[in-house]
Amino acid sequence: SVQSLVRRLDRFRPDDFRLIICDEAHHAAARTYRAIFDYFRPEKLIGFTATPNRGDKVRLDTVFQDIIFQRDLRWGIQNGYLCDIHCRRVNIGFDLSAVHTRHGDYAPGELDEAMEGTADAIAQAYREMAVGATLIFAVSVHQAEEIARRISGAVVVTANTKDRASIIQAFTAGEIPCIVNCMVFTEGTDIPRVETVIVARPTQSETLYAQMVGRGLRLYPGKER
């Protein structure tokens, strides 16, 4: 991991690598990543990301000089690489006016308080509108559990869930109709079976929103949108 490498940089020489490839490159401006890039002297540094806009507005041109290839979600949908989107906005009665912004997004603790009492409405929206395998993004573990209690067969996945792989397998097989997660399936997740995404976690971050919605855009047999 990036964190492990940062602690072990002294095991390498700065010129050990001619090429460095960075996945999830929207993180490249973070301190840990910069420590790695500043240490090594590769001939080329190449980054890949589906979400180049950081929530803290830090520009990636502090790390990368040129964009050599670019495609967006619209292009992917129009050219048959991603599913089309049918979007519906549901008013469930929460108020974010008192929630402060921290690091480019809503303060987590305050957001959790603001979303208190919305589980019934979220579960109702699922029952009325969800199609097929559904992935719900919750603000907190507490909210995820409250939502899951109200949906038959729903399973909660958090950072501490140990049998995550088997849950995803059962979900893909159609044995689990709905997964409610708390900031787990935003990055590095490939579950093409997802047909409906419910964003029950308000955000000011373009990147995070695109990541959540993007979980439902992978192609899968029998899935139209």
Task: Give the label of every model feature segment.
Residues 19, 26-87:
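Post-DEXD/H (motif II) to motif III coupling segment of the RecA-like Helicase ATP-binding lobe
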